[in-house]
């Protein structure tokens, strides 16, 4: 029996004729409160509130069995409803007696006279806003059977939920195995074919790798294991690629080196597969507004796809001691492997795109509704996985989460996005003094990954300094300035902002800026902003607001364009609404970049326009489907957005830029430079200010 029911049962049967339970509510939750006239204080379980505070000094209490207890947490000024009338409890102490809430004399004396009758109790209710207003309130005392019935109903509901969720665990177990070719579960039936461009060509790369005794022993053990599992077989293929071991940070962390096969020559000789992997921004767009997540990881995903007999010889590899093997399954290192596996997963999950997606072997299930709805979605996906014969790793599966790590990001149900600790760790493990050009490339690759997700505020100019060192035309030299640059970047990695993945109900604000050498942008969102401002789901005003119009002019000079910056009534309406709600705006992402040598020769006014074009196109997946507010401190750019450039060969690039901008429908707000700190600091932190 549940401990809570046991405790209530003891209270009800200990022989006390004055045992009194009543129904009360705190916030939106209902509880059974035990009226204890022998208690001097009020006590409650942790579940009655989320606002417990630690006491400065522990409070000693003595309970009915004369034992001492120390209370360390309490909540103050709790509003409690009895018969829909609000009462104030000055303080409730945290103590788990097995009962949800114990109401003691400190409360009863506040609302005396307290009268207990055979079937009811009465208290004097006082209006908290007008203490002179009061009345006697009567509420029913619950009988022993009623209390136990309510308690058992609660346990029954909990049991139903437990059994409901338990079926998910059982369903997951049905598709899990430690062997990717488990014949009882892997029934996909596919045979993968890879073809040579020239069917008669032999790709035999001489293996000149010097192996250590450790290498020989590990190859022997690993290949015997792969043979036993049926993943490889001994080969007589004319083709061969050398195998070797790598031991990077991840391998050191897990305590096992990773075997790698150099298929470079084979990849050059075979026909590729152009099936695309989903973009990260597409994935984030798809899961917008989701509250619940589950992630499933295919067990050694590539190894679940069997190779056609004609393809197996192409995967042959050599390793010590004088061994020649070929794969029975899809191997890592083949250029076609990611596309082949992505196609397999997309086809397997076809029709379920509204609740799940796959990035190679990582499956993400997402739900915008309730927890129960998400559980149902998980069951549907698991059933499909079983039908398609996909094997899942139980160890890596995470079910029914409101926060989940996926593709290097930590995604939360409230729309918040953070960089996963694992991704941060990979960057911080680089030394402050990078050893060579290859290490700089790897370092910048990791940094670019973070920048592409929108976390890094001013990467463009910091990155440019290190990028120059990659070129072999420049003599290799590393000095203290370079070290400080790396340290600066690593320092910023440790204090990156949290980002917000805006949903369709949110209103977006884009801020752009440019200097002579770089451009930048900042995307922010007003949660549920379209409703707050008075816009429909596409960002169009629901009320009749006059719209501005733009027409072609014979004069395309900056002065003429400046005249056109006067905002339409719609622009003014939206901008004024946003200004009042400025404190509610959430950061979505940053972007920055540098202009080419040719572009740096453009007039600064035109660079402001080009910066806007680059920023909007970078975030096209967010901005094409809705209207948004575009903020700029350039009069020229503000006018450019409302002004039709006259077709003229002298204005070629301006016309091209305007054609690119026609895909977007922004509300335009001209702001002062000091009011554009987000984008402005990105371009000017490392360059001299330029007036526009």
Curated annotation (Swiss-Prot):
Pfam families (UniProt xref): Peptidase_A3, RT_RNaseH, RVT_1
Cystine residue pairs: none
CDD domains assigned: retropepsin_like (cd00303), RT_LTR (cd01647)
Nuclease listed as a keyword: yes
EC number(s) stated in the UniProt entry for this protein: 3.4.23.-, 2.7.7.49
List of catalytic residues: 36
GO molecular function: aspartic-type endopeptidase activity; endonuclease activity; RNA-directed DNA polymerase activity
GO biological process: proteolysis
Swiss-Prot/TrEMBL keywords: Aspartyl protease, Endonuclease, Hydrolase, Nuclease, Nucleotidyltransferase, Protease, RNA-directed DNA polymerase, Transferase
Reactions the enzyme catalyzes: DNA(n) + a 2'-deoxyribonucleoside 5'-triphosphate = DNA(n+1) + diphosphate
Domain Reverse transcriptase: 227-411
Similarity annotation: Belongs to the caulimoviridae enzymatic polyprotein family.
Role summary: Encodes for at least two polypeptides: protease (PR) and reverse transcriptase (RT). The protease processes the polyprotein in cis. Reverse transcriptase is multifunctional enzyme that converts the viral RNA genome into dsDNA in viral cytoplasmic capsids. This enzyme displays a DNA polymerase activity that can copy either DNA or RNA templates, and a ribonuclease H (RNase H) activity that cleaves the RNA strand of RNA-DNA heteroduplexes in a partially processive 3'- to 5'-endonucleasic mode.
PANTHER family with a match to the protein in the record: POL PROTEIN, RIBONUCLEASE H
Domain notes per entry: The polymerase/reverse transcriptase (RT) and ribonuclease H (RH) domains are structured in five subdomains: finger, palm, thumb, connection and RNase H. Within the palm subdomain, the 'primer grip' region is thought to be involved in the positioning of the primer terminus for accommodating the incoming nucleotide. The RH domain stabilizes the association of RT with primer-template.
Protein name, per record: Enzymatic polyprotein
Protein's organism: Soybean chlorotic mottle virus
């Amino acid at each position: 029996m549940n401990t809570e029911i046991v405790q209530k049962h003891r209270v009800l049967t200990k022989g006390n004729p004055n045992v009194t339970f009543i129904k009360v509510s705190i916030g939106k939750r209902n509880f059974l409160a035990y009226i204890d006239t022998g208690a001097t204080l009020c006590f409650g379980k942790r579940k009655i509130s989320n606002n417990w505070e630690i006491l400065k000094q522990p409070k000693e209490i003595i309970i009915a069995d004369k034992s001492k207890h120390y209370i360390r947490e309490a909540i103050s000024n709790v509003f409690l409803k009895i018969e829909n009338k609000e009462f104030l409890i000055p303080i409730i102490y945290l103590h788990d007696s097995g009962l949800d809430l114990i109401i003691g004399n400190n409360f009863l004396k506040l609302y005396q006279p307290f009268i207990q009758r055979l079937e009811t109790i009465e208290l004097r209710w006082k209006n908290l806003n007008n203490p002179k207003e009061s009345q006697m309130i009567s509420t029913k005392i619950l009988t022993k059977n009623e209390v136990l019935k309510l308690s058992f109903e609660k346990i029954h509901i909990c049991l139903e939920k437990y059994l409901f969720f338990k079926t998910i665990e059982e369903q997951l177990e049905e598709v899990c195995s430690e062997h990717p070719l488990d014949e009882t579960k892997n029934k996909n039936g596919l045979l993968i074919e890879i073809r040579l461009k020239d069917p008669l060509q032999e790709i035999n790369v001489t293996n000149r790798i010097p192996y250590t005794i450790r290498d020989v022993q590990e190859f022997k053990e690993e290949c015997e294991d792969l043979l036993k599992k049926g993943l490889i077989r001994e080969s007589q293929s004319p083709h061969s690629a050398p195998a070797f071991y790598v031991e990077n940070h991840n391998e050191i962390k897990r305590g096992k080196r990773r075997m790698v096969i150099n298929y470079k020559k084979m990849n050059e000789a075979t026909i590729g597969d152009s099936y695309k992997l989903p973009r990260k921004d597409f994935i984030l767009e798809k899961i917008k507004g989701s509250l619940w997540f589950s992630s499933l990881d295919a067990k050694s995903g590539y190894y679940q796809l069997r190779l056609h007999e004609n393809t197996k010889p192409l995967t042959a590899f050599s390793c010590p001691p004088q061994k020649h093997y070929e794969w029975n399954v899809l191997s890592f290192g083949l250029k076609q492997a990611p596309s082949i596996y992505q196609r397999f997963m997309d086809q397997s999950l076809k029709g379920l795109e509204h609740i799940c997606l796959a990035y190679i072997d990582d499956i993400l299930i997402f739900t915008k509704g309730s927890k129960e709805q998400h559980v149902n979605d998980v069951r549907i996906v698991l059933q499909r996985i079983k039908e398609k014969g996909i094997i899942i790793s139980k160890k890596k599966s995470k079910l029914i989460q409101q926060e989940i790590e996926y593709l290097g990001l930590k995604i939360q149900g409230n729309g918040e996005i953070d960089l996963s600790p694992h991704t941060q760790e990979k960057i911080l493990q680089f030394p402050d003094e990078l050893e060579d050009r290859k290490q700089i490339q790897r370092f910048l690759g990791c940094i670019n990954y973070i920048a592409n997700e929108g976390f890094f505020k001013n990467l463009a100019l910091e990155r440019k300094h290190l990028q120059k060192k990659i070129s072999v035309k420049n003599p290799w030299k590393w000095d203290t300035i370079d070290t400080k640059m790396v340290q600066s970047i690593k320092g910023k990695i440790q204090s990156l902002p949290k980002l917000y993945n805006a949903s369709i109900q949110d209103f977006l604000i884009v801020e752009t800026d440019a200097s002579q050498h770089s451009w930048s942008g900042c995307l922010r969102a007003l949660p549920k902003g379209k409703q707050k401002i008075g816009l429909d789901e596409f960002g169009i005003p629901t009320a009749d607001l006059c719209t501005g119009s733009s027409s072609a002019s014979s004069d395309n000079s900056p002065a003429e364009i400046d005249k056109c910056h006067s905002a339409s009534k719609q622009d003014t309406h939206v901008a004024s609404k946003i200004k009042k709600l400025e404190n509610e705006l959430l950061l979505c992402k940053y972007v920055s970049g540098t202009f080419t040598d040719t572009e740096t020769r453009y007039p600064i006014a035109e660079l402001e326009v080009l910066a806007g074009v680059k920023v909007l196109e970078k975030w096209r997946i967010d901005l094409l489907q809705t209207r948004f507010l575009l903020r700029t401190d350039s009069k020229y750019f503000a006018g450019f957005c409302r002004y039709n450039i006259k077709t003229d060969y002298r204005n070629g690039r301006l016309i091209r830029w305007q054609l690119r901008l026609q895909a977007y429908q922004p509300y335009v707000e001209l702001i002062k430079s000091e009011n554009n700190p987000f984008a402005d600091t990105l371009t000017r932190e490392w360059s001299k200010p330029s007036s526009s």
